[in-house]
Amino acid sequence: ETNDPETINKATELLTEATNRILKWRAWDPWWVEEVMDEWLITRDRLEVQLRGKYGEEVINDILRLVDRFVEYSEALWKYWHETGNDVEKLIEDLMSGKAVVIIRGEGGVSVHEERIMLKVDKTSTGITVQLKLNDLEGVTIKVPDVFRRTMSEEEYERFINDVLKALRGGLEETDGFVDRSKVAMDTMQVWQAVVWALLYPGRARVRISAINVNDGDVTIAWRLRTSRESLKGKILNIADKLSDEGLLAFMFTAILGDGCVRIAKDGRGNDEAVIKIAISDEEFEGWEPLLWRLWDRFRWHKYPGNAVDNVVFYSGYAIDLARAMISVLPPILKDILDALSFEKWLNIKRISEMEVKWRRGEMQIEVAGYKFTVDVQQDDTVVLEHRAKDDTEVDGVISALRARYGDGFAVNIRKSGRYRVVAIPMYIFERYDDIKERVIQVLCKKLEKTKDERRRVITKHLRRLAPIKGAAAANTTKT
């Protein structure tokens, strides 16, 4: 028992949120189980359509039987919920009438027990989690087919399992895995992840529903899968220098599926920009560094520290190159299965891989007095060098560095752009300085090579002004 008013108030807030969510979704009714069953059946249909005609009947039927086991287990949950849903209603009634026995777990958690259901509510760094734990729904053992062995030659399979498959497992385990009774396991709310995880671990696996998540926006099932294999967590990172290029890319692929974000954003000029990000905890980042530095030569990345997390981000052409390279190491049947599962992260990786590499972030920049400036060919028929500063202090630092290098008469323009301050060097200023002009010419030549539209004529005109010989050569190329 506790009489501390603050502790009681916090517990009351958690229970109020849980009660509101359960009432909102009528979680005691089995409608949400039926939606999950429908999702599994849709997944089954998509797999059959995608794979039929490409692979043998035995392979396809084995995959469909795997999905059928999840459907059967969902049906068992549906029957179970018809019998135990009343426990949820009673739990809510007891909470509202003050009859419930509430267990306070520290400052950020409470629990309420019924005969077959336990309500578990926790305050996290990102919000409140509300779970209904099932006390007596048994798990099931499923047999997972080795679809890779059946779709590869013996030589291909041997190479795949010793290199790529091990790395694919390692990436998933590093981001989403944990050890359960000495074996590797994971919890997921996603149907696609349950299928992919299972297929990467052929043999026998144990599946059980560990909890029902009553979220603010929906009700989901937490699936727990435990394989018969020892965990690789931490082991792949320890041998990053020994991974093949294919293994390195396979590891990154599943790590990004686990803890990554893949999207097409808009850059500062409104153009599509590919972005691939993976979040790594502060305490784990040191272990990741050897692997990340192996990627550096081909796929440059940026590190952005966050709240106990480091975000490693690949932009533009480097993100496109990484997406293409990761897809290239996947076996055909895995790509077909991912296509059938059709989940957002995979679709975005494919979309990025199909984008045209117009530039790689930093490729259209030059360094002036120790600061990076983007070479911007503007619509008003001029070229400007722009540096985005986060605040006035950085602006003052840029101006001081420029004038220390080129003299007090070095003029710049300052303007606001969203949350940034832009330091702009006009063309009539930078063309007076040969070292700056030479770097601008190199970037304009790169732009010219990668530009197909009317802007080629504009770039050629500027090259003629800055470097008459190169400009003339570019003009001849444009005409032909």
Question: What is the predicted function of each stretch?
Answer:
Residues E1-T480:
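Internal intein/HINT superfamily modules and their associated LAGLIDADG
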